[in-house]
UniProtKB/Swiss-Prot annotation:
S-S bridge residues: C46-C59, C54-C70, C72-C81
Residue positions assigned to the propeptide: 24-38, 89-159
Gene that encodes it: Tgfa
Entry-linked InterPro entries: EGF-like_dom (IPR000742)
Membrane-spanning residues: 98-123
Organism, scientific name: Mus musculus
This protein's name: Protransforming growth factor alpha
Length: 159
């Protein structure tokens, strides 16, 4: 059986990719050795004369420009961190509201689940639970009482 043209093309492509990858991963030494870059900080501490330069941030002194700059705290913007970022404040407030709502909904759902489990357990063991019997007996049809049958509650019998 002779392979189809498409299969031959895929086979050739696979061989070509394998050869290229083998050449790419060669272990021959590099011709030029890497040169370590000098580590120089672009920032220094601000001088004492600029300790109060930033209103809501940390002062840094730019080495190349020889002037102070500010790294603003979250929620503040501006050259000297003098403006409140209203979008950040609103986003933080919305996040707190969402977390509060989630906690409240979780507590309510847990309370409903616990009450449901207690009611199911109580109704399965009706004879041991007075308040469950009172709930069931309140909804019992009066016709059952009038025919001389015993009611679900032991305290209610018709003479």
């Amino acid at each position: 059986m002779v392979p189809a043209t498409g299969q031959l093309a895929l086979l050739a492509l696979g061989i070509l990719l394998a050869v290229c990858q083998a050449l790419e991963n060669s272990t021959s030494p590099l011709s030029d050795s890497p040169v370590a870059a000098a580590v120089v900080s672009h920032f220094n501490k601000c001088p004492d004369s600029h300790t109060q330069y930033c209103f809501h941030g940390t002062c840094r002194f730019l080495v190349q420009e020889e002037k102070p700059a500010c790294v603003c705290h979250s929620g503040y913007v501006g050259v000297r961190c003098e403006h409140a970022d209203l979008l950040a404040v609103v986003a933080a407030s919305q996040k707190k509201q969402a977390i509060t709502a989630l906690v409240v909904v979780s507590i309510v759902a847990l309370a409903v689940l616990i009450i449901t489990c207690v009611l199911i357990h109580c109704c399965q063991l009706r004879k041991h639970c007075e308040w469950c019997r009172a709930l069931v007996c309140r909804h019992e049809k009066p016709s059952a009482l009038l025919k001389g049958r015993t009611a679900c509650c032991h305290s209610e019998t018709v003479v």
